[in-house]
Amino acid sequence: AVVQFVPVFRQTQAEARAGDRATPDTATIQFVAPLAVLIGVSLVTGVFSGLFYWLYPVHAAAGAVAVYRARNVFRRDFKDVSVLAVAVGVITFMLWIAMVPHDDGQSADFAEALYAAPTWLAAIWLLFRVIGSVVVVPIAEELAFRGFMQYFLAKTVAPHAGAHAASGVAILATGIGFALVHASVAAAFVAGIAYGLVYSYRNRLGDAIVAHAITNLLIAIYVLMLERWSYW
């Protein structure tokens, strides 16, 4: 396959074995590659997009391939997902909607472009938008921020400040980093702290991914049912 020749997608036997341990110490590329791919592809496709991001399916598909290649570092964490993760996902959705005001003008522009397209094209775009938002993005972002950044910050600070203080510093710093890659900075910071707490509670990346996915799923439902397109 073509992706086998792209280094970021290549998984060596050593990385596959490291993935069974699901730590970034020996499988760093698996944690950071999916988000790097999403950001890189968005920068490239953004150049060829107009006011409406019609190339989002390319963005989502590339991210999905990268996530699939990194599956060994997170798939075992879904065997025992906590109820807390689901609850945090729901609460974070409510906070996001409360903190981010709906933009009528942006929604109107979005709807005009979407409804002007052929029905099949709009349907395909919406399908990829939902899959990207609910599946690909949560996994890619949680691998990079909680699985890699928070893990390493806590590990680095712990010898100097103790485990509890290190965890707090890591959650806060990672929350800031998470916020800076989102347009709604304040809401994203709150979400980042929430997902960081869920991750640190049991040290299970799957919990953070589920919480994030639940939030994004509820946002997607909210957007589609009420046509509040500005949240996308």
Question: Where are the model-predicted features located?
Answer:
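Transmembrane helix-loop-helix hairpins at the membrane interface
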Residues: A1, L121-W232
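Specific transmembrane helices
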Residues: V2-T12, T23-P138, L217-W232
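Membrane-interfacial, low-structure loops and terminal tails that flank and connect transmembrane helices
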Residues: P7-A27, Y151-G162
